[in-house]
């Protein structure tokens, strides 16, 4: 058209996208962060932190499933003539989001109990196992100790109870 000029323009705001997934890292000796399928799996063998550096624009992609297992207690000693008892296992807590992580190791896991990530560092505590009892040189009964707690964010699993030495009463 000789009287009207046309300018071809595009609005780039319609094709701009934010982050699809959250970005996270782990700290601490022996702790790892790996990709399994479309999920990131953080494994802690010692204390450290799980740090969320950025979150996804879609809230569903900010769900964090978790499994927190505490340490077991130390077994009881039988001394020279009696038997000691075994100790208790450490506590187990699991939370997940069925749509993202349908697998569960627990028949009691709550269906939608995942934690929604926010940008922060989440402390991770790995409790030590309880110590065994030891008999005294004269054959008396020693005492064992309970396992220690493990925790992630606001989730805490109790340590297992200690064993009873032979001849001891509960």
Language model regions located:
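Glycine-biased low-complexity/repetitive sequence motifs
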Residues: 1-170
């Amino acid at each position: 058209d000789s009287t009207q000029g046309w300018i071809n323009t595009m609005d780039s705001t319609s094709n701009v996208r934010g982050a699809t997934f959250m970005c996270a890292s782990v700290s601490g000796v022996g702790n790892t962060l790996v990709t399994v399928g479309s999920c990131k799996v953080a494994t802690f063998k010692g204390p450290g932190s799980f740090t969320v550096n950025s979150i996804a624009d879609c809230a569903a992609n900010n769900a964090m499933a978790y499994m927190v297992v505490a340490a077991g207690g130390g077994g009881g000693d039988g001394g020279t003539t009696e038997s000691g008892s075994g100790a208790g296992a450490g506590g187990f807590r699991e939370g997940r989001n069925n749509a993202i992580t349908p697998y569960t190791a627990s028949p009691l896991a709550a269906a939608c109990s995942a934690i929604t990530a926010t940008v922060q560092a989440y402390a991770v505590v790995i409790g030590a196992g309880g110590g065994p009892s030891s008999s005294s040189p004269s054959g008396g009964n020693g005492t064992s100790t309970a396992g220690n707690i493990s925790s992630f964010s606001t989730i805490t699993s109790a340590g297992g109870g200690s064993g009873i030495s032979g001849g001891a009463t509960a």
